[in-house]
Swiss-Prot record:
<feature type="binding site">
    <location>
        <position position="11"/>
    </location>
    <ligand>
        <name>[4Fe-4S] cluster 1</name>
    </ligand>
</feature>
<keyword id="KW-0963">Cytoplasm</keyword>
<dbReference type="InterPro" id="IPR023404">
    <property type="entry name" value="rSAM_horseshoe"/>
</dbReference>
<dbReference type="InterPro" id="IPR020612">
    <property type="entry name" value="Methylthiotransferase_CS"/>
</dbReference>
<keyword id="KW-0479">Metal-binding</keyword>
<dbReference type="InterPro" id="IPR006638">
    <property type="entry name" value="Elp3/MiaA/NifB-like_rSAM"/>
</dbReference>
<comment type="subunit">
    <text>Monomer.</text>
</comment>
<keyword id="KW-0808">Transferase</keyword>
<dbReference type="InterPro" id="IPR038135">
    <property type="entry name" value="Methylthiotransferase_N_sf"/>
</dbReference>
<feature type="binding site">
    <location>
        <position position="156"/>
    </location>
    <ligand>
        <name>[4Fe-4S] cluster 2</name>
    </ligand>
</feature>
<comment type="similarity">
    <text>Belongs to the methylthiotransferase family. MiaB subfamily.</text>
</comment>
<dbReference type="GO" id="GO:0005829">
    <property type="term" value="C:cytosol"/>
</dbReference>
<dbReference type="InterPro" id="IPR005839">
    <property type="entry name" value="Methylthiotransferase"/>
</dbReference>
<feature type="domain" description="MTTase N-terminal">
    <location>
        <begin position="2"/>
        <end position="119"/>
    </location>
</feature>
<dbReference type="Pfam" id="PF04055">
    <property type="entry name" value="Radical_SAM"/>
</dbReference>
<feature type="binding site">
    <location>
        <position position="163"/>
    </location>
    <ligand>
        <name>[4Fe-4S] cluster 2</name>
    </ligand>
</feature>
<keyword id="KW-0819">tRNA processing</keyword>
Length: 449
């Protein structure tokens, strides 16, 4: 059997897309995945262009597999994802040994691209945007474990000044309601108990309640439908946009117990001046109002966020406003980075007088504060009973299992060997016994039937 190696960079959307690449090639080519690139017949890099370092790392890693092409002339090397969309033919010009280049919307064409490469002897590039065609062409999802990602929409229409996503993944396109629910129902039949709904702006999803009937459902309606699917016990979603947080979505946190008490809500900055320069479309006051409404509906809601430090023109005063917002909201997790100019975005043309060492110092302060708040939340959970979904063997010890709480905390706990395998994929109750810097420890209380 032929083997497929995939290296994934970037977001959870890319993780999902990589699984779909494996599904497409598994169904069409009979190829199985491997963790060893040296034994692979197909090597794919699913790329991210959000930050410059991630982009350059792709070409670095391509160079590391170049020699395999000489050892195995029939080896197929492909580059997909957002760097592929952004660079296109330039990838082949820079790395002529690359056989196929494809975008996020054309990954379903991989078998045809590989066949064309073999037939013609020329590298194949397809970075077009055929809207939702990708999902129509996908084979049924194959999953292992009780948790799965489901992409419900593609692209972004917000055009924040720092972001390449609208240019690399296209504008927002929602999958039809029936298709999303059918995929999730199929996953539930395979034993999946937890789904994470994915999209660049996942809460911007819109879909017809009945196809061709003209009546439109919003993201809150979709959540209600997912909650009714037998076997699905826990629902997450990412990444959301503050501008798409509606009253109906706030109400969903009251109506839908299966919706977790954790939300990733990117704010990017605590300065109105910087938010306006980023073209985020909300003020700090409006963001705090959203947080108040969310916590009125779900008081124990855990919030994480995205932060960009050192945006062009940011001052010490702007940064201190971000730190103040972090304290006021109580964020307990973040993806935070120093601003990286992306070619083709409006912000790339702005003057950027802030020294790099200042930006790095700001980032260190911000991350330290977030870590402190995360530890405080974890410490507050010690002694409490928590419902977790057991995901598998702990990385800490083969004698232990690990799972996640409703608010997305990793819990490691000892499990007796006769029952260890049977607990994987099940919900159980654990008592939290201690809080470590990046995880919790617990002990089993009960197992759900």
């Amino acid at each position: 059997m032929k083997k497929l190696y995939i290296r994934t960079f970037g977001c959870q959307m890319n993780e999902y897309d990589s699984e779909k690449m494996a599904d497409v090639l598994g169904a069409g080519e009979g190829i199985a995945k491997t963790d060893n690139p040296e034994e692979a017949d197909v090597i794919l890099f699913n790329t991210c262009s959000v930050r410059e370092k991630a982009q350059e790392k792709v070409f670095h890693d391509l160079g590391r597999v170049k020699h395999l092409k000489q050892l195995k002339p029939d080896l197929i090397i492909g580059v997909g994802g957002c760097v592929a969309s952004q660079e296109g033919d330039a990838i082949v010009a820079r790395a002529p040994y690359v056989d196929v280049v494809f975008g996020p919307q054309t990954l379903h064409r991989l078998p045809a691209l590989i066949a064309a490469r073999k037939q013609s002897g020329r590298s194949q590039v397809d970075i077009s945007f055929p809207e939702i065609e990708k999902f129509d062409a996908m084979p049924p999802a194959r999953v292992e474990g009780a948790s799965a990602f489901v992409s419900i929409m593609e692209g972004c229409s917000k055009y924040c000044t720092f972001c390449v996503v609208p240019y690399t993944r296209g504008e927002e396109i929602s999958r039809p309601l029936e298709d999303v629910l059918a995929e999730i129902a199929g996953l539930a039949e395979q034993g999946v108990k937890e789904v994470t709904l994915l999209g660049q702006n996942v809460n911007a999803w819109r879909g017809e309640i009945v196809r061709d009937a003209g009546e439109e459902g919003d993201f809150a309606f979709l959540l209600e439908c997912v909650a009714e699917i037998p076997g699905i016990e826990r629902i997450r979603y990412t990444t959301s946009h503050p501008r798409e947080m509606t009253q109906r979505l706030f109400d969903a946190y009251v109506k839908i117990p299966k919706l977790v008490s954790q939300l990733h809500l990117p704010v990017q900055s605590g300065s109105d001046r910087i938010l306006a320069a980023m073209k985020r479309g909300y003020s700090v006051l409006e963001f705090k109002s959203i947080v108040r409404k969310l916590r009125a509906a779900r008081p124990d809601l855990s919030l994480s966020s995205d932060f960009i430090v050192g945006f062009p023109g940011e001052t010490e005063e702007d940064f201190e406003k971000t730190m103040k917002l972090i304290d006021e909201v109580g964020f307990d997790g973040s993806f935070s980075f120093v601003y990286s100019a992306r070619p083709g975005t409006p912000a790339a043309d702005l003057e950027d007088p802030v020294p790099q060492e200042t930006k790095l110092a700001w980032l260190a302060r911000l991350q330290k504060r977030i870590d402190e708040q995360a530890q405080a939340v974890s410490q507050s959970m010690v002694g409490s009973a928590q419902r977790i979904l057991v995901e598998g063997v702990s990385r800490k010890s083969a004698e232990e299992l690990m799972g996640r709480t409703d608010n997305n905390r990793v819990v490691n706990f000892p499990a007796p060997s006769p029952h260890r395998d049977r607990l994987v994929g099940q919900f159980i109750e654990v008592r939290i016994t201690s809080a470590l810097p990046h995880s919790l420890r617990g002990e089993i209380l009960t197992r759900e039937s």
